[in-house]
Curated annotation (Swiss-Prot):
The encoding gene: XOAT10
Membrane topology of this protein: Single-pass type II membrane protein
Stretches in topological domain Lumenal: 41-441
Positions glycosylated per UniProt: N154, N212, N343, N381
Region entry Disordered, spans: 50-81
Name listed for the protein in its UniProt record: Probable xylan O-acetyltransferase 10
One Pfam family in the UniProt entry: PMR5N
Source superkingdom: Eukaryota
Cytoplasmic side: 1-19
Bias (Basic residues) ranges: 56-73
Short motif (GDS motif): ranges: 171-173
Length: 441
């Protein structure tokens, strides 16, 4: 501003002699202005964002993660404003919509996502068609939330977002079923020569080599150490949990970018749970009994502490899948009082149905414990929508662990499995919910 003025003064009045005072004043003022400009530029640079070029706040907040790098802060159910969780690629279709509330819609055109024989990773305990199930209707039901829709599962998108990452499921056989379901949903998008699955004791690893990604399952039915930790030989009636000891298992969880926990079925042994104080190697074992809800909360609190100490919410995500219901008494939903899930071919239509085998007390513990976590833990609530699916269990159409007796053969419902689920089927929907929470929170 001063230079034009100073230049004008220099040319004014033709050859008039300049005053030494005016010349000195002009030079001093010009020097001050020059230094001020330099200082302003340096101060702006110090902030790494020049004042006049700072982008609007909303532009900085909605930047989407780029695979494979994820540097966003973690989201939280207790707040977090516009902070985008890691792996998010978009917002939920309808804010405030509870995807766990809705109904099952029969849709032969859109379900199943894959055929049983197309996925070589399904265990024979879950291949219902191969073991003689006469109907396929259980494969064709699509979950429709009330007031919104789930985002369509995109295997290519998920694999791209998992590039260079490690995703791990931790829990029991129901969590393993969900793990296998996810592998089946993804594997067709991976060339045959670029994928593999291996099992190492309690750890199963599926590798998508082109993406340098792994999807893993780790057997830990109680999450804490227990006498049921053998991934194959674990049918123990007298179950004992070693307090809050996670170290044996948790060393395998470290380094995972996405963790998906579950733990419920193995806790359903009665009102009391045996808790070991000390080690399984101790000659004299100190075992106490605790109320199941108290013991369950104790272990989940230990999981929360581990998550807070080991998972960075800026580049990782943690989920907990709620309880999977059973359908062992058909009188619970108004059918023949002597039956169970055997020969059931349609879902329960009563939207208020909640089976007696599903503990609301443990459900409450899940909500209370994970709501205190300093690292966000996403709850994948599969319970209510699964309550309706009395038709989706493996029933008798699976590999049997032991030869059937003549009495069992004469009475199929006596050995029907009303706990586990056929694949493809219900657990694919669980992964649709997980997909929604992971990429469209």
């Amino acid at each position: 501003m001063m230079k034009p003025q100073h230049g004008g003064m220099a040319g004014h009045g033709g050859g008039r002699t300049r005053s030494p005072f005016l010349t000195s004043y002009a030079l001093t003022l010009a020097f001050i202005t020059f230094v001020s400009v330099l200082y302003f530029k340096d101060f702006s640079s110090t902030l790494h964002q020049p004042f006049l070029t700072r982008p609007p706040p909303h532009r900085r907040q909605i930047a989407r993660p780029r695979a494979p790098s994820h540097h966003h802060g973690g989201g939280s159910s207790s707040g977090g404003g516009d902070v985008v969780p890691p792996f998010a690629v978009g917002a939920a279709a309808a804010a405030g919509c509870d995807v766990g509330v809705g109904e099952w819609v029969y849709d032969e055109a859109a379900r199943p996502w894959y055929e049983e024989e197309e996925c070589p990773y399904i265990q024979p305990q879950l291949t219902c068609q191969a073991h003689g199930r006469p109907d396929t209707a259980y494969q064709h039901w699509r979950w429709q939330p009330r007031g919104c829709s789930l985002p369509s599962f995109n295997a290519t998108l998920m694999l791209e977002m998992l590039r260079g990452k490690r995703m791990m499921f931790v829990g029991d056989s129901l969590n393993r079923g969900q793990y296998v379901s996810l592998v089946c949903l993804l594997h067709r998008s991976i060339p045959e020569s670029s994928k593999s699955m291996e099992t190492f004791d309690s750890l199963t690893v599926f590798r998508a080599k082109n993406y340098n990604a792994t999807i893993e399952f780790y057997w830990a039915p109680f999450l804490a150490e227990s006498n049921s930790d053998d991934a194959v030989v674990h049918r123990i009636a007298d179950r004992i949990v070693r307090g809050t000891a996670l170290e044996k298992h948790a060393r395998f969880w470290k380094g995972a970018d996405i963790l998906v926990f579950n733990s419920y079925l193995w806790w359903m042994t009665g009102q009391k749970m045996k808790i070991l104080q000390g080690s399984f190697e101790d000659k004299s074992k100190d075992i106490v009994e605790m109320e199941t809800e108290e013991a369950y909360g104790m272990v989940l609190n230990a999981v929360v502490r581990w998550v807070e100490n080991n998972m960075n919410p800026r580049n990782s995500r943690v989920f907990f899948v709620t309880m999977s219901p059973t359908h062992t008494r058909s009188k619970d939903w108004g059918d023949d009082s002597d039956g169970n899930c055997y020969n059931q071919t349609t879902p329960i239509r009563d939207l208020s149905y909640w089976g007696p085998g599903t503990s609301k007390g443990l459900m409450r513990v899940i909500g209370e414990v994970f709501s205190t976590s300093k690292v966000p833990v996403g709850i994948v609530n599969i319970t209510q929508l699964s309550e309706y699916r009395k038709d989706a269990h493996t029933q008798i159409y699976k590999k049997q662990w032991n030869p059937l007796t003549p009495e069992q053969i004469a009475n199929p419902k006596s050995y029907a499995d009303c706990t586990h689920w056929c694949l493809p089927g219900l657990q694919d929907t669980w992964n649709e919910l997980l997909y929604s929470k992971l990429f469209f929170p």
